[in-house]
């Protein structure tokens, strides 16, 4: 194997970002950073699945409007979500006449979309690529755990799937933030079977990717102004810190988790914090990106994490394999 880390010779630059979040996310600590929030997570639709499609569609339209661009100016859209056969992304793209690639790495899908888009631009095949993902608490609960109508009690280690959509436009033309490099993750399985404890399942995958990234680049964790994992939650973040110490790469105080950032754990009763494909996407396309633009952060490593289970695998007693991909963003001086 050559290397898990790709340095882009012709890097993609972020042209614009957009984020729309649900009512619970709006009440969280970073609620003011989102472009738009909704008061009703059904968005007036007949099902939560349709609501997620509506939210994803609205986010892409808002993104194009912010960038003052038309669909015809976009060469490709790389999108994903958590629903069966990524119907959320597929149905969203019915509204756009844009070439489309649907991807899936569970809650690490946002990083995968950026890696795919950046690679197309680096190779000269595309000029502008949209990368987007969505997730919805109620549709995810129905698919992976229990329908809300059952009223099941949530476990202490459970996390709250983020209702949101995040999207950005990658451009070959120089901008303020570039995608410098990316580390592709491997599938890691530590034998966790509890679908209500995904932080424990995903932390080893985040560890493996971070260690590979630091070894491939020769960097230390403090090289970055901040490192953000996607949705390990409070318990998963503690496990990651412990594992990274064992590997000889202790994480600095500047490390944080998007799932911890997006909610007030105690006040909002969200268990260990946020999760979901849109957790890292919505936090990056609002809070993190704005801090990069204003110069508070110049070098950021984003490491979205994904639990690769399905409703069938859980019922069959399978363990939960996980993956994490890392993307390095640099503020252009």
PLM regions and their residue ranges:
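Active-site-adjacent elements of ketosynthase-type condensing enzymes
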Residues: 81-97, 137-150, 236-237, 283, ...
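Condensing-enzyme catalytic core mediating Claisen C-C bond formation in acyl metabolism
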Residues: 1-49, 147-211, 216-219, 252-269, ...
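Short beta-strand segments
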Residues: 79-80, 129-135, 300-305
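Short glycine/threonine-rich loop-to-helix capping motif typified by GTGT followed
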Residues: 90-93, 232-247, 312-319
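Conserved beta-ketoacyl condensing-enzyme motif
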Residues: 14, 49-105, 223-238
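A short, structured active-site edge motif that brings together acidic residues
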Residues: 101-108, 256-259
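Short, well-ordered amphipathic alpha-helical segments that serve as non-catalytic structural scaffolds
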Residues: 52-68, 116, 201-216, 283-288
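Active-site-proximal alpha-helical scaffold in enzymes
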Residues: 104-131, 170, 275-296
